[in-house]
Every structure is written in structure tokens, then in C-alpha cells.
Amino acid sequence: RWYEVTGVQTCALPISMPLPCDIKFERDVPVKLRDGITIYTDVFRPIDDHSHPAILAMSPYGKEIGSQWLDDVPMRAGVPKKATSGLQKFEGPDPAYWVSHGYAIINPDVRGAYNSEGIILFFGSDYGRDGRDIVEWTAQQDWCNGKVGMSGNSWLAISQWFVAAEHPEHLTAIAPWEGLYDCYREVATRGGVMMPEFIKFLTESFASTESGGVEDCMATMLENPTMNVYWRDKIANLESIITPAYVVASYTNPIHTNGSIEGYRRISSKEKWLRIHNTSEWDDYYNSAHVEDLRKFFDHYLMGIDNDWKETAKVRLSVLNPGNKDIIDREEEDFPLQRTHYKRLFLNAADGSLNDEISKNDSNHGYDSDSSKRSVTYRTRMKEDTELTGYMKLHLWVQAPEHDDMDIEVKIEKLNCLGKKFLVSPMKAVSAKGYMRVSLRELDLERSTEQQPYQTMAHIQKLKDREIVPIDISIWPMGILFKKNEYLLLTISAYKSPPAESIP
């Protein structure tokens, strides 16, 4: 078995953080999965004869620099080069930090990635069982104390939902940092609107070889546009998860916001915590204060240290405030907030307003989806300082003359007291969005609530000529502050595909 000792104060990459300790680096360690497939993992661990807890970071990007890297992200998403050592896999924990605190880091090339046998899976129960195999292999190593955690953001966070749902005996704690859980409703489609661009961009970045390959999720999406056995297997069974969990979310992520928060709400773990931050997923994950916070969680569960982690508030909440100072880490008991007051606003097409009372006059609003003006807007001026935190929905009656379907996008934004948008970083677009393909409007009455409509996505109901139908559009969670006389802007538009590379 090949290994090397990476020495203290050396740098793995130019300008990177010097290593704080000596590290034993074992490369391409073979791991046999339950079906005979062999995958390969890198192991970083302390140089001693003691047993240590391990942290697993599971993804198909490559166990070293791989096919994606922070340098590929504009301005490294605010993560300075000196904040990391360069030993970490993309979106994974930095071995330099964790080994110096007594942990081993397990960075596998999952099934099909690089030299690992098989084809890369786009999540699902088999992917989760692969993770279970890796967890149990790790726990059996003589350098491991039998306790394994999981960490990482985005794909590495989604992996944790699927692996934890398979109940590996030695999986002791998870820390999913911004990860969706439903591959159909949150990445292949939104509200039934197909979004193949990101899946294509993502799968092309996987570290597959000619001898391997990637599950063709995009082709399956085009062949199977409605919910079926295939897509149900791509939904993590959150309710079956009982592992202690530290979940991190944000309002500004275009694919992970809903899944991260729903993951926290729906897992059955009795010991679980949620933190909603106000930056980007990478900036937050590698922020030194948050790394220390995560270590306190892992120290408690993986090392058995009797620290004060359990005194941490169950929910720590950020509330965004464009044009002013955000609220950060406000302590709460739950999400959505128990003191939430839900309010209805009625659309008035005559003047484009949102009002407390329904208009006495009938009106309608329309747009041409093929023209440059493919949207309509409504606004309301805040009569007092207001916090909008939690879930929203939009109820509409719609028709599509001479067409049998519609793809709708809705967006909630804050405007200043002059009715102008705030200037914010492209990495921090402050808006809450929802989508709907009208032919997939059928509600799941068992899952839907007054605040959160939930579609079955199982039956296509095409529109008849000039038929008017009601639809309920779920708008993903948001936390935002309005000062008196600032505006809430609602935009309803025909959906237009974004550039794939703009979706993290």
C-alpha cells in the first residue's frame, strides 16, 4: 500500500495554508463493496498508533483536486487560498485541520469515478448502500475507533441523506451542509418544469473514465417526465434517518435551500440542529468559525467529549436585509417560526398592486411568452417594519390561449423605498422563487398544507383551449427584513432556462 508522510509546515499547493501537523496520507486504498465492485479511497490520518474517529466525504468529483475545484468558482466564492491546505477534495473537509485535531479523513472515488469500478450513480438507494459499505469498511480499520461521521456541502451533503437512510451501524453523526434530498423536484425539475441544463453540466464534470461511465439521468428525465419508480428511488427517505445531525442551509442557493431545510424538519433524529447562514455554501463551509463549530459537534459525538454542544440552540437563523445589516445566528426553537403570522395578499391586475382586500372588480393580466416582455409584476409598500421568514405560496387562476401547457416562474424580491432593486453580489441573489408546469398541477392532498402545496407530479393534465384552471405554486423558504415604505415585488413570468454554470 502506497503512503507518504506529509510534513508539518509544508504547503500542498502554492499560497495554501501550511500544514499544522505531520499527516499520514494513504493513497488508492482498495475498498470492496457488497456486490464485488472495488473502489479506491485516500485516507489522511494522524501518525500514531491510536484509534481515531473518521469523517467520510463522498462524491464523484475526484478524491484529490479532481474535475471541480474552488478555483473554478468566481473569486473562489470568497474562500481565501490560505484558508485551505489543498489536500481537501472539492466541497469536502480539509485533512490539514481535522487530522491536527485527531480525526481521519476518508476521501473515496465513488463507484465509477476515476479508477473505481462500475458506473457513477446519480444518487438513489444503491448509492446510499455504497456509502453504508464505505462507512462499515472504515469502522473496521485498526486505526478507527469505530465511529464515523460524514461532512461536506452540495453533492457531499446530499450523499449524507441517502447514506444515513440506509442505517450504517457505525455512522454516528452527519453534517449535511446545503444539500437537496429530492432529485426530481429539486434538480431535474422545479414544479415539474424540466431543468436539464444543470444535470448536463454536473455529470460532465464527474471524474469518470472511458472504462466507467455515468448514469444517464438526463436521458431518463426526458423519457420519464413524471414521477415513477425511478424518480421515487431518487428521493432520500428522510423520515427513516435517526442519526444525530447538524444541518446547514441558506436562502440564496438555487437548488439546495428547500432540501436542506426540509431535511432538518423531516428527519426523525431526536438530536438535530439547523443553522441558516447569509453567505455562500463554500464561504460558509470553510469559514474558520464554522469549522470550529462543526468540530464541537463531531467532538461530542465521535470523540465522546462532554462539551457544551447540546446547549447549542436547535435553530440559528439568519435574516437577510439588503441595503442594511443582516441578522445572523438568531436563536430560535424551530423552523418555520412558531410565532409566524400568515397573511393573504390579493393581486390586482388593474394597477399591479398587492392588497389586503380582494378587488371588487374582475381583472386579468397576461404576457406573451415569446416576446421580450414575458412577465407581469405586482407590488405592495410595507406599512411598517416587517420580517418575512418562512414559506410562501402563490395561488393563481391561469389559461394559455392556443396552447395546452405553461411553464411559470415566480419571484419575490425586496425593493427600496424608491422602488429600485438593491445591488447585491451575484453569489447572493436575494429572492425567493417558485416554478410550475401547469399540466403537473395536481396536488398531493395528504402532503400539501395551507402554506406548502405539494404536487404529485404523477399525472399530466393538459389544458383545453382557453380553459382556466387554479394552480398553487410553492415558493421556497426565505428570511428577509423590510423597513417601513420599502416594497415587496412579485414577478410572474414565462420560465427561461438559466446558464447551467450559474447554478452551484
Cite the ranges covered by each PLM segment.
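Single conserved hydrophobic/aromatic residue that forms the stacking wall/gate
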Residues: 1-11
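Active-site-proximal cap/loop segments of hydrolase catalytic domains
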Residues: 12-310, 314
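Generic recognition of flexible, low-complexity loop/linker segments
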Residues: 17-18, 28-29, 93-94, 233-237, ...
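Short, surface-exposed loop/turn motifs at beta-strand boundaries within globular domains
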Residues: 22-24, 34, 240, 338, ...
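Residue-level signal for short segments within beta-strands and strand-turn junctions
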Residues: 33, 45, 319-321, 412-416, ...
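Acidic/polar loop patches that form or flank catalytic/metal-binding clefts of enzymes
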Residues: 145, 173, 274, 303-318, ...
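Catalytic cores of secreted or luminal carbohydrate-active enzymes
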Residues: 293-310, 319-374
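Intrinsically disordered, low-complexity Ser/Thr/Gly-rich stretches
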Residues: 347-504
